[in-house]
Amino acid sequence: MSDSTFIQRIARWAVLPAAIGLGFGLSAFSAPAAEAATHYCNGYKATIVGTNGADDIEGTSGRDVIVGLGGNDEIDGNGGDDIICAGSGHDEVDGGSGNDYIHGGSGHDSIEGGSGNDRIYGSSGNDHVEGESGKDKVYGNSGHDLVEGGTGKDKVSGGSGNDTVKQRYASDREEDRWEDRY
């Protein structure tokens, strides 16, 4: 390799980081947004996409469609009527405020709906699903789940498996409807 070839290679590698840093600004770090076009949650195109590693994903104050993919993720929907699919891994999900749709995916997940009228679905793992406040629909699905309605008039089902359904608020006892048909 001649000296001029070596210098050209260095110049090419030096220009690339500068172009990324100056020409594209922070958008150079938006790889999840580029991937969002290929991922869907409950039929909606994702606006925020995690990776196959362990991610800490924060939604916005508006409506988000979040797909966690693999890994043991921590997902916070924050505000808005969010649609969240946690994906595989042992995930922790908090829907935040708003009327959210949350699906845990495979793995042993911990899901809290937050405030609002939420629809929450565990999946094949041993999940802890909790509606919190609002008129929620909470489903453990398969696995040995802990299912809690929270405050409000809730519809709760453990699904198949050896489940525990917990009533946290005595004043709410007459409001909730338990639906296990397995």
Regions found by a protein language model. Give the residues of each.
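Bacterial N-terminal signal peptides that target proteins for export
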Residues: 4-17
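C-terminal segment of classical bacterial N-terminal signal peptides
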Residues: 22-33
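N-terminal segments that cap or nucleate solenoid repeat domains
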Residues: 35-81, 181-182
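Glycine-centered beta-turn/loop sites at beta-strand termini
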Residues: 41, 50, 59, 68, ...
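Consensus positions within tandem repeat domains that build extended binding/scaffold surfaces
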Residues: 54, 63, 72, 81, ...
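Short, low-complexity, Pro/Ser/Thr/Gly-rich segments in the mature regions of secreted, periplasmic
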Residues: 160, 164-182
